[in-house]
């Protein structure tokens, strides 16, 4: 009897160190993402794209693919709407639109706050790019100025909210964030003091809303 107890105890302890596969879920559209009704897979891998890759080809910060499955890779590139790997969520930039602008290919990191989704991507369009405009580019102008501006945009990130009805992206600037913080005067007061609408600023307020909603 004692031998069985010892054996079970050893198995229990060793089980704590067994490798655990990450939960991987693919969502075909926004409805599936909202309702958490996706397809579970086990072979996906996430790769952070380099700055040079983004500068040359545009698109999101992450490439998500699988090994030796061309059909699934094609689906991930062109048709898949979003992917969740454990607690990390990514949306397919190919599916996103901000006014008449597109975000290219690959995937963008996404936050789930309340019943809304916010993804982090390069600034596009006049409203967004104004938040990341390099002062050097404004001074120089011409081809050199354009090159500096393009390089600055590769590194710049802002947040967009996915409209749950239309699926289109809405830029999350200070005005939008102020509306989201309605009912939290202390956070609104802090936001008024901010000098930037960049992602590294806005993420603090999105995280605060996440905590308040828990």
Language-model region placement:
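C-terminal partner/receptor-binding element of secreted or periplasmic proteins
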Residues: 178-214
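Aromatic-patch recognition
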Residues: 24-187
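General "foldedness" signal
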Residues: 10, 15-19, 173, 183-186, ...
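Bacterial Sec-dependent N-terminal signal peptides
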Residues: 1-26
């Amino acid at each position: 009897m004692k031998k069985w107890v010892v054996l079970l105890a050893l198995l229990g302890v060793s089980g704590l160190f067994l490798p655990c596969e990450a939960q991987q879920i693919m969502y075909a559209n926004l409805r599936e993402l909202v309702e958490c009704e996706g397809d579970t897979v086990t072979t996906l891998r996430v790769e952070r794209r380099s700055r040079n890759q983004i500068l040359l080809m545009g698109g999101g910060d992450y490439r998500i693919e699988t090994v030796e499955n061309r059909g699934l890779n094609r689906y991930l590139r062109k048709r898949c709407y979003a992917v969740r790997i454990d607690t990390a969520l990514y949306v397919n930039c190919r599916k996103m639109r901000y006014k008449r602008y597109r975000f290219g290919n690959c995937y963008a990191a996404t936050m789930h706050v309340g019943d809304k989704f916010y993804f982090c991507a390069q600034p596009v369009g006049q409203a967004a790019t104004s938040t990341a405009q390099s002062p050097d580019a404004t001074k120089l102008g011409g081809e050199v100025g354009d090159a500096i501006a393009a390089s600055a945009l590769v590194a710049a990130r802002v947040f967009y909210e996915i409209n749950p009805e239309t699926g289109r992206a809405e830029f999350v600037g200070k005005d939008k964030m102020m509306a989201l913080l309605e009912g939290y005067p202390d956070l609104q007061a802090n936001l008024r003091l901010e000098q930037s609408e960049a992602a590294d600023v806005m993420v603090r307020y999105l995280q605060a809303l996440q905590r308040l909603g828990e």
